[in-house]
Design a protein with these regions (language model features):
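The feature marks the mature, well-folded catalytic cores of soluble enzymes
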Residues: 1-450
Length: 450
């Protein structure tokens, strides 16, 4: 078992957080036979991260190699993408060698071409699969893929030069009822190709597809995006924001965890407005302990409180309001998967209400998201690593939902800052990690040296 992490500057609106806080907590709390591959940049910040994490690199795996291995990438830390889930997907060839399929991110240094320095015989391939790994969830049996990944596929001009480059999303805007069957057939053809490229041996599931085409037929799907980003064709901007994967239950069904904003509202509305203000008042102190900075300068809880003014905005009240607007999409995704035979477990969720609407322009809130987490399922082990946001009733309800599903809960520090967002929810632990759950072989140098 291997966890890949990116040491970049996690930044939102000029505010930065120190990723080594959650790196260290994750390594302390995960089993000692879990290996970590940490991508760092060739600059002073990368050197600093390696120095902080040096004690963990001295730990040994059962195979005798270092538990933590660093891979240097050609980029500056300030420009390095910290969300390890998104930029590539990990496949294997017929010989079991790793393939890192780049997901079309244009930022430096992608595609990353030196994974072979860590993993024996690893290959890099450049793909054009829109939206990245965070929008695709896989198990040994299935691949669950978000609609935006498919709607974002480019329709390139063939031999006629004056044809415009479009996406399936832009084509769908002009589809009328008469031409809908033809467009659906075209959409399915592209889906079949992606299925073959990514995981031909797995069942492909697209939770938002049925709802999208039903709304398209009724001509009430709102095409409001210039790019395929948060189009409304899926419950959240990435599948892993609202959907997590569990084990096979006693009846043979795959357990899936789906965010539930209705239950989040029920919990939030049970407490008094005064209690909600107290929770908002306590958030800056938690962010201070997580190392929140403004352009690298550490902030005090008083400065954080003055900048964000969550009490004044009544953040939790806005979160309650926002919950009602997205509940139906989440419920439909849960219903769709349940109808396919999955064992659906709903996890309380309170989306950020300080979104990018005009009256909240440039404001940053927090999405109380417990679905974007890291689960471990192997042998008899059932563990979930999740955040605590300081909203005690919601924190406890989310943890209890996982415990009721048979999982041991492990809280990880350093995850409130990744919850910062101007949208419904931001990234979490699943976004920050890319894991390999099958045997790998290290590059020869590790066995020679260690």
């Amino acid at each position: 078992r291997v966890v890949i992490l990116h040491y970049g500057v996690g930044r939102v609106g000029g505010f930065w957080f120190d990723q080594t806080i959650f790196f260290r907590d994750l390594m302390d709390k995960m089993d000692k036979d879990v290996a970590f591959v940490i991508l760092v940049c060739d600059d002073v910040n990368g050197d600093r991260a390696k120095e902080i994490l040096k004690p963990y690199s001295r730990e040994k795996l059962p195979d005798g190699t270092s538990r933590v291995k660093f891979l240097t990438v050609n980029a500056k830390t300030s420009r390095f993408y910290p969300w390890a889930r998104d930029p590539y997907m990990i496949l294997t060839d017929n010989n079991g060698n790793l393939i890192f399929l780049d997901a079309g991110y244009n930022e430096t240094p992608f595609p990353i071409t030196n994974f072979h320095a860590i993993f024996a015989n690893a290959k890099s391939q450049v793909g054009s699969i829109h939206r990245g790994g965070g929008n695709i969830r896989t198990t040994n049996e299935e691949m669950i893929i978000g609609m935006d990944t498919l709607l974002g596929l480019k329709i390139f001009p063939r031999w006629i030069q004056y044809e415009n480059v479009e996406s399936l999303y832009s084509l769908a805007k002009d589809v009328d009822r008469e031409n809908l069957p033809a467009f659906k057939a075209r959409f399915d053809a592209y889906c079949n190709f992606i299925h073959k490229v990514l995981a031909p041996d797995k069942m492909m599931i697209i939770p938002g597809k049925k709802d999208f085409f039903e709304r398209l037929e009724m001509e009430n799907f709102p095409f409001t995006r210039k790019t395929v980003w948060n189009t409304g064709a899926q419950p959240a901007y990435h599948t892993d924001v609202y959907l997590g994967l569990g084990h096979i239950d006693e009846s043979g069904k795959r357990v899936v965890f789906i965010a539930d904003s209705k239950s989040g509202v029920e919990i939030a509305e049970k407490i008094s407005p005064e209690e909600r203000r107290q929770i908002e008042q306590n958030l800056p102190a938690l962010l201070e302990t997580e190392g929140l900075t403004a352009a690298g300068v550490p902030l005090t809880k008083e400065q954080i409180s003055e900048r964000f003014q969550w009490e004044k905005h009544k953040l939790l009240d806005l979160c309650i309001e926002k919950s009602y607007t997205i509940a139906e999409k989440l419920d439909k995704a849960a219903e769709h998967l349940e109808n396919l035979g999955y064992h659906v477990v709903r996890i309380p969720y309170l989306p950020n209400g300080l979104d990018n609407r005009g009256r909240n322009d440039a404001a940053i809130g927090i999405g109380f998201n417990y679905s974007n987490v890291l689960t471990e399922v192997y042998g008899g082990i059932r563990k979930v690593y999740l955040p605590e946001f300081g909203f005690r009733q919601l924190d406890e309800a989310a943890a209890q939902a996982y415990r009721d599903a048979g999982f041991q809960t492990v809280t990880i520090n350093g995850l409130i800052m990744p919850g910062f967002t101007t949208g419904n929810a931001h990234a979490g632990l699943d976004c920050l990690t890319s894991e390999i759950r099958f045997p790998v072989r290290w590059a020869k140098k590790y066995y020679d040296r260690d």
